[in-house]
């Protein structure tokens, strides 16, 4: 092979190697660009998954009283790993809220209550992922729990969880709405229309406002007022509060709900919107992600549908 031919061959190989490197770099940057776009794009997340799981224990014999606990909670995958870990921890804590209060992490006052009242603690929590878009996740936690003896000292409570998938921000009711006297007029009208109850009078609405703002000092001695909201699949809002017993209010002698909630249409909330980024996310939201049911979900033997306590009522 002559020098000229060998030179041409080397030149051809060099061009092939160079082209290969350029192609590899292009593919690499394209992949990186896809990942960055997927993580940071204003379009949000579309392919994430919410898998429901369950914490379950039945008479572990680790305590001076029996326990039957079935807590369903969502586990999120497919978004930024840091935000995902943070959000999953918050979802779990929200699901376990009353279990932590009465059972796992009791205060001194609750421990004293346990010593006099507990022969059993039961909790049954269901989680309903009511809305999931490329930006927002909204969950309704509904719980029955028995704190004391007999087991039909059952309280029914509810709480909402609303989060920004891009930033991890958790939205409370007062983050997105101005809760004032005019808002209570709207809320009261919606509540009475949907329940068929008589209209709330001025005194009742003023008292209710103090509950939503958590300003009723007399109430705090017996119940903790806990406002909540969540978004429905139709992008309407369920707005309400639950009165959770501090101590002896938990003695009910029958299943008792202290939940006050109603559906409010988004257009009716317009005068009360805050400047929260939630509203921009909400307006641009479209359904996204997938919710998977809890596998091998266990029914609570005392509080589940058709279970123990319902035999007494």
Question: What is the role of each PLM region?
Answer:
Residues 25-29:
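Hydrophobic core
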């Amino acid at each position: 092979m002559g020098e000229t031919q060998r030179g041409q061959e080397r030149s051809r190989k060099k061009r092939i190697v160079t082209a290969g490197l350029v192609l590899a770099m292009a593919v690499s940057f394209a992949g990186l660009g896809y990942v960055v776009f997927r993580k940071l794009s204003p379009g949000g997340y579309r392919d994430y998954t919410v898998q429901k799981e369950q914490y379950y224990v039945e008479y572990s014999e680790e305590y001076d009283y029996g326990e039957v606990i079935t807590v369903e909670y969502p586990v999120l995958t497919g978004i930024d790993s840091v935000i995902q870990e943070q959000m999953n921890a918050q979802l779990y804590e929200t699901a376990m809220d009353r279990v932590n209060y009465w059972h796992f992490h009791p205060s001194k006052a609750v421990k004293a209550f346990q010593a006099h009242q507990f022969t059993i603690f039961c909790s049954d929590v269901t989680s309903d992922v009511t809305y999931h878009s490329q930006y927002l996740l909204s969950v309704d936690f509904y719980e029955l729990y028995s704190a004391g003896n007999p087991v039909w000292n059952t309280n029914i409570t509810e709480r909402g969880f609303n989060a920004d998938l891009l930033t991890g921000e958790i939205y409370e009711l007062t983050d997105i709405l101005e809760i004032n006297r005019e808002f209570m007029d709207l809320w009261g009208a919606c509540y009475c229309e949907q329940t068929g109850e008589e209209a709330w009078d001025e005194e009742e609405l003023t008292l209710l406002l103090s509950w939503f703002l958590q300003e009723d000092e007399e109430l705090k001695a017996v119940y903790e007022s806990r406002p909540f909201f969540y978004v429905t699949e139709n992008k309407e809002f369920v707005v309400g509060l639950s009165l959770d017993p501090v101590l002896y209010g938990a003695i009910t002698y029958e299943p008792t709900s202290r939940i006050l909630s109603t559906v409010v249409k988004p257009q009716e909330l317009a005068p009360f919107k805050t400047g929260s980024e939630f509203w921009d996310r909400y307006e641009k939201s479209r359904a996204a992600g997938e919710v998977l049911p809890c596998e091998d979900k266990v029914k609570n033997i005392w509080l589940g549908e058709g279970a123990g306590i319902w035999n007494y009522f």
